């Protein structure tokens, strides 16, 4: 082994003793010593990308300086050593694979664009991040992870990024984690992993839907880990979609959770009434269906689960009107949509309510069951009380015991507090939270119903 490699190994060994295993494995282990630029009073290092370069300089620059000032590690260094970290020069890839990215099986859907994405207060941040990512020649944030409940437009925004990138003649791969797994297993069985790696690692935009389903599959996680690292090191844009934040993806390897949070994460909130009405109008236009204004308003007000349900309601009204040879009016809409208006959250268990609130606020259920002064935990406990009073027959005493409350009168105060935020203050955050929690409750209860019906 040459002297420079020995020096680098010595430096990394000293760093490893001073930082946590996760920080070392995910970040600091990627430092490369640059002997050509280093001098007696300055030690130069390479980091694989600007994000790591800035992060290590800000968080561990002083530590590196201290280590090198106190340990000579084979270098002729002065007593006081400065440390510089730069982005490593890109390695030219000699032979690019000849892949038709637009012909990949899991390709981008042409119908999902930025132009037909309805923007509201619930998703404006996500929309702006997505547009910036799609329009930039180099990744402004990497990776990007959007998360939120089902049917809120996450897949639409992912495809919109892909479509815009394709217009700029970029190489785009858009795939669900399920299809990524299927493709991985196929190439593994056929012993053609080189082809698999070329397909997914030599693109400009790697867009992954349903990232949460990577968890619990060690071989797939290992392959994705290396795919992610190579794409990131080569400044290729990575965008991930998930139904929950990285820290709440149970069973996902810590090193992947860490990488998912390297760039920027943004939550897609349920649409408010104004946005829902805009979505209903747009879906009518896309499906070439004409509905009276009052019917569109009725759908926006009463079909609150998700965007797909709103579109389903529009089509259901139109189909029934044609079959019955009847004009579309409010009475017809009410009759046709009666089953969709039923609140599936009725009869929820306290455990499901606790889980739905925890998922919506990115908390653990165990955190909510213990009294805390943290604002998000206090709000979560109030929301559990609010939904329990709405949807369960549990008496105040059992609810107080469930949340470990000594004073049973606190239940009424907590319920009234949420009601005030919703009805008097009309807090946009709490209003959107209510919709998201209801959506999650519906999903949890529907799963329970499906399970019992299959027994």
From Swiss-Prot:
Residues 322-455 are annotated as: Domain IV, binds dsDNA. The keyword Thylakoid does not apply. The keyword Cell cycle does not apply. SMART domains: AAA, Bac_DnaA_C. Residues 107-321 are annotated as: Domain III, AAA+ region. ATP binds at residues 151, 153-155. It holds the Pfam family Bac_DnaA. It comes from the Bacteria. Coiled coil: none annotated. Keywords: ATP-binding, Cytoplasm, DNA replication, DNA-binding, Lipid-binding, Nucleotide-binding. GO terms for biological process: DNA replication initiation; regulation of DNA replication. GO terms for cellular component: cytoplasm; plasma membrane. PROSITE patterns: DNAA. One of its GO terms (molecular function) is ATP hydrolysis activity. It is found in: Cytoplasm. Residues 75-106 are annotated as: Domain II. CDD domains: AAA (cd00009), Bac_DnaA_C (cd06571). SUPFAM superfamilies: P-loop containing nucleoside triphosphate hydrolases (SSF52540), TrpR-like (SSF48295). Residues 1-75 are annotated as: Domain I, interacts with DnaA modulators. Belongs to the DnaA family. Plays an essential role in the initiation and regulation of chromosomal replication. ATP-DnaA binds to the origin of replication (oriC) to initiate formation of the DNA replication initiation complex once per cell cycle. Binds the DnaA box (a 9 base pair repeat at the origin) and separates the double-stranded (ds)DNA. Forms a right-handed helical filament on oriC DNA; dsDNA binds to the exterior of the filament while single-stranded (ss)DNA is stabiized in the filament's interior. Oligomerizes as a right-handed, spiral filament on DNA at oriC. This is Chromosomal replication initiator protein DnaA. The lineage of its organism: Bacteria, Pseudomonadati, Campylobacterota, Epsilonproteobacteria, Campylobacterales.
